[in-house]
Amino acid sequence: MSFLSRQQPPPTRRAAAACSLRQKLIFSPGSDCEEEEEEEEEGSGHSTGEDSAFQEPDSPLPSARSPAEAEAERRRRSPGAEPSSPGELEEDLLLRGGGGGAQAAGGGAEGDSWEEEGFGSSSPVKSPTTAYFLGSSFSPVRCGGPGDASPRGCGVPRAMDDPCSPQPDYPSTPPHKTFRKLRLFDTPHTPKSLLSKARVIDSSSVKLRGSSLFMDTEKSGKREFDTRQTPQVNINPFTPDPVMLHSSGQCRGRKRAYFNDSSEDMEASDYEFEDETRPAKRITITESNMKSRYTTEFHELEKIGSGEFGSVFKCVKRLDGCIYAIKRSKKPLAGSVDEQNALREVYAHAVLGQHPHVVRYFSAWAEDDHMLIQNEYCNGGSLADAVSENYRVMSYFTEAELKDLLLQVGRGLRYIHSMSLVHMDIKPSNIFISRTSIPNAVSEEGDEDDWISNKVMFKIGDLGHVTRISSPQVEEGDSRFLANEVLQENYSHLPKADIFALALTVVCAAGAEPLPRNGDQWHEIRQGRLPRIPQVLSQELTELLKVMIHPDPERRPSAMVLVKHSVLLSASRKSAEQLRIELNAEKFKNSLLQKELKKAQMAAKVAAEERALLTDRMATRSTTQSNRTSRLIGKKMNRSVSLTIY
């Protein structure tokens, strides 16, 4: 659509002051406005070319007229209708000029430069009439008919009305295809960004993912969630990959919630996304309003132990009738340093699961700010109790029992280290004894102890100092069993610190004097010297214990090497796995011998065949020579000579 804009000469007097900047729009042939003009002509049936607000470019342009001439022209078109005041005349001119009537053609002196959207300047020209139009509260009034004497009667029917209607309707808005194309406002609509639709996030604005795809959420009443109401959970730091629990498993699974059109908002989405991905707050050990689970589910039989952390009670569970060991903290742990140790023990138990040489964990809960842990009950008590009893009666663990202790606890450490964890508090009071006559089943590693070992099972317990090998948070244990490198805060060989403590534990079980907590003797032990043992041990076992407390942690054997040491695997104590290994080795040797035997047999057979073939060849050669001799003719014989003479 093309435009021709002609600036009229500045008018004079009051009309010039009111409409000094308006321009007339003249459309070129073939424009869309000609269709409007045709529709207006069809609707009115009597409008002429001079009644149209749009003129052909070849038609003569009206010259500037005075206000008196404009008033006379309006009186001529609407007889009997006189404006009461110049202000009313201006209002009438504005309405009729915007409506496309003849007054628009005759009011060239009042025109602004009204431009079509997308052409010319990007902002309209503000004129006094435009300001008057915006400031007033009137609306265009429909005419009662062509003969209406009101000054607001426009006399121009709407193009969309039926041309056959005797009383055609008149437009209540300027008869333009798009009202906004007239640009009668001072400024265009400000583009709204996504941020302009921001609203305060509440639980009612966040819908479940995908709820708006298949049904109306308002009608369906689909349940909603609030990220602030999400139940809190603890994050176990001893799982194989604790970081992926929030970045992989949750960030991928939970995405931003969908918002409806009225509340769609990037800031709200980002706020919710950050709230979702933020690590969950840790649940602390607080007072519970629930009824005591300890008294409800368990019946306390006796107190079987006490330590720095708390007391251990022997209890029977009312539901299954089995005996369990319930550890209860002595004092409230909420907000204390011991709270982290209690949680660390629960985390470690949950990750390690079930192993024949680790005390089994069942459950844990908090009551009145106290932590309670339900563990496996070991009927033999702790190794410390056994050592104390032996010391009282002046008896000791035999060498066979010491080897069994070293082997079983070594297997437990091998399992803990395989989970990338370290115990960091191996000592006699943390090793428990379970006496049973039931043969032990094959463990996860395929190890099965013999009947003697099954009568006494040594299990590692008290996991309050467990930490990860890769990212250690070391809480130093008993100084009597603490390796020197840990005291120096060298955490590069933490599994070897458990080996060091295990060697001293075996020394205590062998009958040695109580270990020092500090002093010269303490440093002598860290230099690789064993404490004095009141019984005579084999040289092999003594050397093994010395290697286990070597000052250089790299020289100490790992738990994997320890459980396969030849000293611990005697003929009467070899595991089924070791016996199978030896059996397979013997089978392999037998197979090699069988192959060698087959090769020797094949070689002998080939040699016999070669000898037989050689004999046949010799016999064939002699027979051939004899045949040749018998067929020879003329040897030692007179040959007949015939001669013919012609």
Swiss-Prot record:
The modification Phosphothreonine is found at T187, T190, T239. Residues 96-110 have a biased composition (Gly residues). The lineage of its organism: Eukaryota, Metazoa, Chordata, Craniata, Vertebrata. This is Wee1-like protein kinase. The active site is at D425. PANTHER family: EUKARYOTIC TRANSLATION INITIATION FACTOR 2-ALPHA KINASE EIF2-ALPHA KINASE -RELATED (PTHR11042), WEE1-LIKE PROTEIN KINASE (PTHR11042:SF72). SUPFAM superfamilies: Protein kinase-like (PK-like) (SSF56112). Residues 298-568 form the Protein kinase domain.
